Amino acid sequence: MPRLLLIETSTSLCSTALAEDGRIICSRRSTEPRAHASLTAVFVKEMLEESGWTVRELDAVAVSAGPGSYTGLRVGSSTAKGLCFGGQVPLIAVSTLDILARQAIEAGLPEGCKAILPMVDARRMEVYTAVNSPEGARLTDISPVILDENSFADLFASGPVAVIGDAAEKFAPLRATAASPWRTCPPPDPGRGRGPSEMGGAVVSAANEVPPEAGCGCANGSVFMQCCPEASAMLVPAMRKYEKKEFEDTAYFEPFYLKQFIATTPKKLF
């Protein structure tokens, strides 16, 4: 089985992991603000020393392809590309939304789940999102969306949905307004011995919008997981790409930065 280095820097969480034989053997993470540039390379160095590997002994380097913050993605992609050039190993790019979808699967989907809705915060009520199947397959293109009470109404009407990402907490109250009561679940824990507080995630709380006693389940059992993407959750989608030899052109690879937001909500004509 291949040896993979996994780098995830698309949001406020900076995380890295090493995998062998389809399992994570070591990882590093930090939620320290604006520390991606100073920590990513350090984390990689520490893990390689811990494992006893060299960069040339890696079979591939996988990095988050976005969408995400410009600074974080730039740090992650430049680190990954430098390692690939220096070690002469291939580069794998994994969508941030696909990483989140995998985290939802590892955390546990609601019974009868119809879809996974990963979301990356783009400030205000703006998000980047896509619809994934309960198995994690992408069903729609990544697109910018301005959230309101009617967002994805048809999707929620079809059955339980798992919403995950650093924008889940701002979408949950909108769905609670549209279909109260609702419930939340803990963020995923793909690492070894890490609890929710150490994950950089949090249970979405209805305390500010809907009192907890309002109910123990959304009208259709949907759940909302507030968390950031983790490097360890990249393993499964990265392995799929590795097996298919879906490698990037290292010299020309650029991640999907959060650019100027152009999504709009329809205006009333009368």
Feature annotation, model-predicted:
Residues 1-65, 228:
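N-terminal beta-alpha supersecondary unit
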Residues 17, 128-132, 256:
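Conserved hydrophobic/aromatic positions in well-ordered beta-strands
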Residues 23, 90-189, 198-229, 262-263, ...:
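Surface "functional belts" at beta-alpha junctions
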Residues 31-39, 70, 74, 78, ...:
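Residues at secondary-structure transition points
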Residues 49-56, 85-94, 109-111:
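Phosphate-handling active-site elements
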Residues 62-96:
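DPxDG-like acidic metal-binding loop motif
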Residues 224-270:
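Acyltransferase
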